[in-house]
Amino acid sequence: MKTYPNVHVLDHPLIRHKVAIIRDKATTTKQFREVIEEIATLMAYEAFKDVPTKKIVVETPLESVEQTVVKENSIAIVPILRAGLGMVNGILTLFPAAKVGHIGMYRNEETLEPQEYYCKLPAHIDEKVVMLVDPMLATGGSACDAIIQLKKRGCKKIKFLAIIGAPEGVEKVAEKHPDVEIYVSTLDRCLNENGYILPGLGDAGDRIFGTK
């Protein structure tokens, strides 16, 4: 795959360890859900090294001191439904004051193209750093459509987080939206004829919610 300045593969031993757990078909729904949240927390930690901050004065038991804190109201989390919901709580662990929106999409199994069915976003989202999340970046169709919806609403700083990415999807999003920072935990081999990532982990939504 070509290299892109806006694509970041988070090569960290803790993330690799947890990705191995969610790949395993023997992993239970409960454990899968928990580990997805843990990976999301680790990814958000890396992706938000440039999080907006401000200076405040804190009173310690001994004296006053100037400290740097996060502007928590400057962040919005937007999961692509339904699998993206599995990553939200992990990110809220770091940013409990973040606003949460939702973009609902499903994949047409014949065309493999995304179909939007729901979009509800926080007020003034155009003033926030938006973290768009989906565990899988496969064809890139859903991610691109979701990014377009955010840009239509004036969003200027968007970060897209996916736990597992396929080269086809990563390239598509990177080329169509070079202004969006893309973070993946791991880059897999390819897509199969049905648009699933190989080796992947199966259907993330089904495994998070225990459905078939």
What is each stretch, according to the model?
Residues 1-212:
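PRPP-associated nucleotide enzymes
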